[in-house]
Amino acid sequence: MGSRFLILIFAFISLCYSQNEINIKNLAIIENIYFVKDSKKPFSGSAFSFSKLTREKILEFQIIDGKKNGIYSEWYINGKKKSKYNYQNNLKHGRYTTYYQNGKKKEKGFWKHGKNEGLCTYWFENGQRKKEGIYKSTKGVGLWSYWYPNGNIEREGYRNNGIKNGFWVYFYDIGVKKSKGNYFDDFKYGLWTFWYTNGNKQSEGYYKKDKKNSLWTNWYANKQKREVGLYIDNKEDGEWIYMSENGEKILSGYFNKGKKVKTWSHWYSGSRKKKQIEYNEGIIISELCWDKIGEIISCL
């Protein structure tokens, strides 16, 4: 129905207004209606504009009874097409395409009565896809995909009413998975997992409304555990244990709402104690230190 309407508009314009052309500088816009300057009658016909530098046409569109109706075209000053839209009663309606100056496509999609509607695809200037997804009344819905300029997938997931809802997965530009998890109303929720560029797991735990709320485990790139501890509302809480890259415990202690409390113990390799510090709400109360043979030394 929409395409037939546009065809009828174009035919009407061609028959009735092919001889009625005007430079846009001779038009006035009053309450979004085009008039010939010093005229009270809405203009109908073809409006155009030329580049002051090259004298090449850079704009042309059709007007019926003062409103944009039909094809709306733009060109770069080098003569290459910049965009092509369709209008219906001053609103973008129907298929559109925009281009980079090098002639490659920039965007392609649809408008419906002034709002993005349906599948829309975006490209980088090198011709690689940039992102693609479906709009409903200008808001993203369903599966959306994003790419790096090198053509590798960057992220992919679901939107509802324009915001992230559902499963999303992210990748490094080399094609290796970076992270995955779920969103609810644009906030991270539930289990999230992160990876290093070598494919080994980096960290894992649960989110609640974008805040870490669970036991979280972090790993070194060589797969050895790095640290384990609890988060409550994105703040460390309870006992935390830290390990070296070879798997030995090197530090442990307690947090309360993100502040160090109680006893914190440091170890040399081989489980020999190195330092012991007492904290109260993040403030050091006392400390003891040992050398590598177990003798008490001054803490510097």
PLM features: residue spans?
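Sec-dependent N-terminal signal peptides
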Residues: 5-14
